[in-house]
Amino acid sequence: MELNLEPLNLPGVESKRPLVIAGPCSAETEEQVMETALQLAKNGVKVVRAGIWKPRTKPGGFEGHGAKALPWLKRVKEETGMLTTTEVATAKHVEAALEAGIDILWIGARTSANPFAVQDIADALKGVDIPVLVKNPINPDLELWVGALERVNGAGVKRIAAIHRGFSSYDKKIYRNLPMWQIPIELSRRIPNLPMICDPSHIGGRRDLIAPLCQQAMAVGMDGLMIESHCNPDNACSDANQQVSPDILDYILNMLVIRDEIQTTE
């Protein structure tokens, strides 16, 4: 199935590499969300992310505040002019996010691995013109990733991008999720006009890996970066080890070397 795609065309965001999406793993408090967003905006970030509903691996962890936190992102948009994005995993999430004026939605790795869940989300998006970002499934299955993209596009959503966040593996010697760069590269070969965004936070799982992973993503031609950033990362309620402060993020972005010629990973 050939995808019918249009450019993301994000208002107020220049169409240059890399598109940067940054913000906390979880929306913990209104103050934390606002403080992080204000610092990111000061450094030129135009799109803020925050997890509202958190699909945790095991019960008992911080699972987010749910719809209660959506007004916090609305306030961010009103006070900073930033675009907002959050993860949706059900049709109810989609409806709540749209009602709150969220600008961009993303489908997480656990959800994209489930065709039934993706189809429910796609059905909820019919008739809605909103950018949707689709993370790779947790397992290294290119066809499953393509299938999720096709389901969303089949609902009439044309502004779509893919997010590469690595793949689950029992071997976690270096990375939290193995990058397996050949898979997103093959996806880009198959669908050349599909924007590709790298999530180095979930690939690396550690702050010290974010900078080199960002550079690798640029070297293989990815269009954007989704990076977890927190105003006080050491005290984050979730994924503290992979979040960086807005100032450290700014340093990482300023150190990137962006070339027109794309390198391979061979």
Ranges and model annotations:
Residues 35-52, 100:
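Catalytic domains of carbohydrate-active enzymes, especially glycoside hydrolases
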Residues 62-86, 121-131, 181-196, 242-264:
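Alpha-helix-loop-beta-strand connector modules within alpha/beta enzyme cores
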Residues 18-35, 59-61, 83-88, 108-109, ...:
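Active-site mouth loops of central-metabolism enzymes
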Residues 26, 52-56, 90-92, 109-113, ...:
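Active-site-proximal loop/turn and secondary-structure-junction residues that shape catalytic pockets
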Residues 1-21, 264-266:
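N-terminal amphipathic alpha-helix/helix-capping segment at the start of soluble metabolic enzymes
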Residues 49-68, 230-240:
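Glycine-rich, proline-tolerant flexible connector loops at the mouths of alpha/beta enzymes
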Residues 19-24, 46-50, 84-86, 105-107, ...:
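Hydrophobic faces of well-ordered beta-strands that scaffold small-molecule active sites
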Residues 13, 117-232:
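Catalytic alpha/beta core domains of metabolic enzymes, predominantly
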